[in-house]
């Protein structure tokens, strides 16, 4: 059961799998295991696909769960949490555990993975999640969490109610989320998130070009990226950007705008990738004729273009390094300015950042020269 096996169930069955569970797995898996245990036929079970001799049999889909609170609490007692704690401690860090508060995403970015849960959005209640956090704190002394939702707190007033529930339970936690800049700007969301313990938020900034954002069907504005970043920093919440290069129609001018945005807004971290055509997406349909024999992740390596973009894979690999160096340079300059104004702000990390400026500067110049050469040879 996975998004990949749901999309490519024939390959999994041909490789020897007995059954593939399509979509959500909890109810179907429970019923399937019961039938196997009782040596009963599963041929009429909703939500599975299997082979009958050489024929693929796809049963009707199972209706998606709407009230996630009906599910029992995750069986953390089956996990050796102490072993994970030890690994984190060896790296000088406190353990962080993953929690899923929602399923699905109602937005329609045309390049995004077709979610296993469909274009919908169901969530646990703030009270359920607070109860789970309380259990993890009491039993494993865990207070750091990664909320692994595609979109955290989309429902109106969810984050505000979550903040209230945590206060009522006297829980002080630190957590990281993924969100959208337009969602963060609604009502008093950032205030409630900061009060409840939000440490860092990863947002899909994607591009500094409004033209590219519109082409992606992203549904966000550059002005929202700027405003959300500003407000998060005011609340001392770290903000990190997902950045995507290589989308159809992207020019070197669009790339320059993205780099300029990163340097100006100074996110606390960045994750850089190239546009990737996942089967089941609108973007895949747009570029599938260029893929030839390539298909999905098996034919792609790090930052490799699978379709004919404006530039080739070598360009984007070099661009990845260049963007990170320019980003680190701009961080060093900012740290230097802050320390000049207020020397008490100096720290080992800031000092290291400033010293690395002298490494990144000549290296970035060489990368820029190589990129310019690649751009000219591409004309």
Regions found by a protein language model. Give the residues of each.
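Glycine-rich beta-alpha loop elements in corrinoid/cobalamin-binding modules
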Residues: 1-65, 274-280
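Catalytic cores of alpha/beta
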Residues: 8-14, 249-264
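Radical SAM enzyme core and accessory elements
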Residues: 105, 282-288, 294-296, 300-379
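Radical SAM [4Fe-4S] cluster-binding motif and immediate context
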Residues: 74-247, 260
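Flexible glycine/acidic-rich beta-alpha junction loops that bind and position SAM and/or redox cofactors
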Residues: 4-9, 53, 107, 157, ...
